From Swiss-Prot:
Matches recorded under Gene3D superfamilies: Aldolase class I (3.20.20.70)
Record bears the keyword Cytoplasm: yes
Gene for this chain: kdsA
Record organism: Shewanella baltica (strain OS185)
UniProt superkingdom: Bacteria
Pfam family, one: DAHP_synth_1
Main localization of the protein described in the UniProt heading: cytoplasm
Family indicated by similarity: Belongs to the KdsA family.
GO CC term (a single one): cytoplasm
Keyword DNA damage appears in the UniProt entry: no
EC number: 2.5.1.55
Listed GO MF terms: 3-deoxy-8-phosphooctulonate synthase activity
Disulfide bonds, paired cysteine numbers: none
Protein name: 2-dehydro-3-deoxyphosphooctonate aldolase
Length: 282
């Protein structure tokens, strides 16, 4: 199958196009922090010439503890998204968890994300598909790469072919994730754009007493490996103070390192996509 191109305004999302950054913060902690982080991303990506989509969640519905911070909720979250979009002229991506969220969220954001833990929930898939919005499907930690075809088929049969596939690691025993680089390449064979969530792939699920741990010190190494595959995009989360982030701080890139980090990712992407393809199957 040839590479599918998804058009998001002037941005082309495809495996053989320059990579698109899907980046921001894990969860909306406050309006002011979200605006500040969005401004930093916007400035850095514009400087480096990287197509960019702002990401944040309005509700983290799958936290380890019932007492953990979840976010401002949909109504307040959409107000913040609207302000970010208007102020910085950025396209937006966020996740939904329930059927009733799909339509109102799709009115504000440009891409809606299907969470990994919910990727087989047919009612949610159908509701997302019917919005006509671009969909980012997080590959569940418990599915093989080739099994993503079933989720793709559900979206297709519900009337939506604007699909991005996102790798975020696979379960490896207890409290651990690994990234199968060949698995990402296998997903690319579908023709749909594949992006790499290099933040959540660093998780240690349940690695803390009441929250997920992570391996922030290896954020660059893992992302470099993924970018060497020639992907449609990179998905990352950053925070000005990761140790005090309200969610997934152990995986978050320190915001002050964003520019140097992205310089390396762009250099790898440019190099890999300058090569002629090699068909080693023959």
């Amino acid at each position: 199958m040839s590479n599918k191109i998804i058009n998001l305004g002037s941005i082309e999302i495809a495996n053989d196009k320059p990579f698109v950054l899907f980046g921001g913060m894990n969860v909306l902690e406050s309006r002011d922090l979200a605006m500040s982080i969005a401004e930093t991303y916007a400035e850095v990506t514009q400087k480096l010439g990287i197509p960019y989509v702002f990401k944040a969640s309005f509700d983290k519905a799958n936290r380890s503890s019932i007492n953990s911070y979840r976010g401002p909720g949909m109504e307040e979250g959409l107000k913040i998204f609207e302000e970010i979009k208007k102020t910085f002229n950025l396209p937006l991506i966020t996740d939904v968890h329930e059927v009733h969220q799909c339509a109102p969220v799709a009115e504000v954001v440009d891409i809606i994300q299907l969470p990994a833990f919910l990727a087989r929930q047919t009612d949610l898939v159908v509701a997302m598909a019917k919005t006509g919005t671009i969909i980012n499907v997080k590959k569940p930690q418990f599915l093989a790469p080739h099994e993503m075809r079933h989720i793709i088929t559900k979206f297709n049969e519900a009337g939506n072919d604007e699909i991005i596939l996102c790798e975020r690691g696979s379960s490896f025993g207890y409290n651990n994730l690994v990234v199968d680089m060949l698995g990402m390449d296998e997903m690319k064979q579908s023709g749909y754009p594949v992006i790499f969530d290099a933040t959540h792939a660093l998780q240690r699920p349940g690695g803390r007493a009441d929250s997920a741990g992570g391996r922030r010190a290896q954020a660059a190494e893992l992302a470099r490996s993924g970018m060497a595959l020639g992907l449609a995009g990179l998905f990352i989360e950053a925070h000005p103070d990761p140790d005090n982030a309200k969610c997934d701080g152990p995986c978050a890139l320190p915001l002050h390192q964003l520019e140097n980090y992205l310089k390396q990712m762009k250099a790898i992407d440019d190099l890999v996509k300058s090569f002629d393809p090699i068909d080693t199957s023959k």
